[in-house]
UniProtKB/Swiss-Prot annotation:
Compartments (UniProt record): Cell membrane
Protein's name in the database: Non-specific lipid transfer protein GPI-anchored 15
Keywords: Cell membrane, Disulfide bond, Glycoprotein, GPI-anchor, Lipoprotein, Membrane, Signal
Organism: Arabidopsis thaliana
Lipidation (GPI-anchor amidated serine): 158
């Protein structure tokens, strides 16, 4: 009787783990759609400073036909596929191609971008907003060529630095737990 209970608990844990792993990954239709962006690899891996024309045209068609796939790619962790993908450069790809995209804040992992609120009518009074650049303490101001953000390799911890647990490792761990009850 105890063995049945442990198998049932293990089975429920396995189903829950598999469900959470598959829920976090893009759908297969989005994976095939995103693979059409292969001409963009040289840009998002840092091997090119500007995206190619085929990259920009394919990105434009993906954004027009399947914007939910772009949201899915942004919301999912970058899998370890042997490529050194620069997430910052990947997120700057639409700007580099001069392509308008919905703001990332409108991405919803389940449904893709949501509709934008209607623009205020010309008769409505909207407050004037002045945008001014801000600077960090100790930053120099004045004439210069701008600044570049360079990612640093620190010793601090961050949840973004942790790779997701691979499915095959999870399956191996479940197998070990299941077979350990026979020992």
């Amino acid at each position: 009787m105890g063995y049945r209970r442990s198998y049932a608990i293990t089975f429920v844990a396995l189903v829950a783990a598999l469900w959470s792993v598959t829920k976090a990954q893009p759908s297969s239709s989005c994976v095939s759609t995103l693979t059409t962006l292969s001409p963009c690899l040289s840009y998002i891996t840092g091997n090119s400073t500007t995206p190619s024309q085929p990259c920009c045209s394919r990105l434009d068609s993906v954004i027009k036909s399947s914007p939910q796939c772009i949201c899915s790619a942004v919301n999912s962790p970058i899998p370890n596929i042997g490529l050194n993908i620069n997430r910052t450069q990947a997120l700057q790809l639409p700007n580099a191609c001069n392509i308008q995209t919905p703001p990332l804040t409108q991405c919803n992992a389940a449904t893709g971008p949501t509709a934008q609120p209607p623009a205020p009518s010309p008769t409505e009074k909207t407050p004037d907003v002045t945008l001014t650049p801000t600077s960090l303490p100790g930053a120099r101001s004045g004439v210069g060529g701008g600044s570049k953000t360079v990612p640093s390799v620190g010793t601090g911890s961050s949840s973004r630095n942790v790779d997701p647990l691979p499915l095959h490792f999870l399956m191996f761990a479940v197998l070990v737990v299941c077979t350990s009850s026979f020992l």
